[in-house]
């Protein structure tokens, strides 16, 4: 696998306890907060410019940035070679405008330029679907909130 095969169009994270989904799609970060009240999802979506770094929970020395993140974390090959769902516990470091935060999340699907990957969830998500999410981030709720 060449390094460029690890480039992705989108990468999605979910924090169960704070009801947040983070999605880095193309060059934008989406922060989607959701809360279910009386069987109705209340959704707030922020679309922001920013950067994202990844850090494996079990290895605080691993810190990687944007497109090289999966490659440098050493899990890229495993993602490409497997079809079984795996969950990595991960911290994401966000730099949005002048704010910086660190969130504990599960790593959800990564959509690569070379095709569809099923990862961390039972649903497959394609490049076409990731483009739809970019246009309408509410679809993140449909895909990843039970």
Task: Say what each PLM segment does.
Residues 1-146:
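Amphipathic alpha-helical "stem/stalk" segments
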